[in-house]
Regions:
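Transmembrane alpha-helices and adjacent helix-loop boundaries
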Residues: 1-165
Length: 165
């Protein structure tokens, strides 16, 4: 489901459904609805990242751990997950960056973030070029910084890893 549809459903649909049931005092703020929407959207992608990371570890690793007498849980904690995390970290950081960019979509429900602030400032000053230029630069600074941090983390987790020729 597209994030904007999910945000509209949670912000407008759920309160309407709850009020139809008979709860007249139910209120859902834009911040809460936006946070729920973004969390549900990112959660689906994160689950897929974790699934793929765990499946990327050779099945023989689990068999070896089990043959040594480790329980399933201990095999996952001590053998599978440490290897899977190495492959998951870049995707997790990438998903974080995507979620940060997705917050701009939530401005349509009044979610207080950078794009919403830009809209308010443009409405008050009528200086669209300057305001949107500053907003774009702010997004770029944050995204470039996060991308560089991701590269450092990626290099650090790959230290000592044998490269296949």
């Amino acid at each position: 489901v597209p994030l904007i549809v999910l945000a509209y459903f949670i912000y407008f649909g759920i309160p309407a459904a709850v009020k139809a049931i008979g709860f007249t005092d139910f209120k859902l703020t834009a911040l809460v609805a936006g946070t729920i929407s973004l969390s549900m959207n990112a959660g689906a992608y994160m689950a897929e990242i974790f699934r793929a990371g765990i499946q990327s570890v050779d099945k023989g690793q689990m068999e070896a751990a089990r043959s040594l007498g480790l329980s399933y849980g201990k095999s996952m904690r001590k053998v599978i997950l440490p290897q899977a995390i190495r492959t998951m970290i870049p995707s997790i950081i990438n998903q974080f960056i995507i979620s940060l960019k997705d917050t701009s979509i939530l401005s349509v429900i009044g979610f207080p973030e950078l794009t919403k602030a830009g809209n308010i400032i443009v409405g008050n000053t009528f200086k669209a070029l300057q305001v949107w230029g500053i907003v774009a630069v702010m997004y770029m600074v944050v995204i470039i910084t996060l991308s560089r941090v991701a590269k450092r983390i990626e290099r650090r987790i790959n230290v000592g890893k044998l490269e296949a020729n």
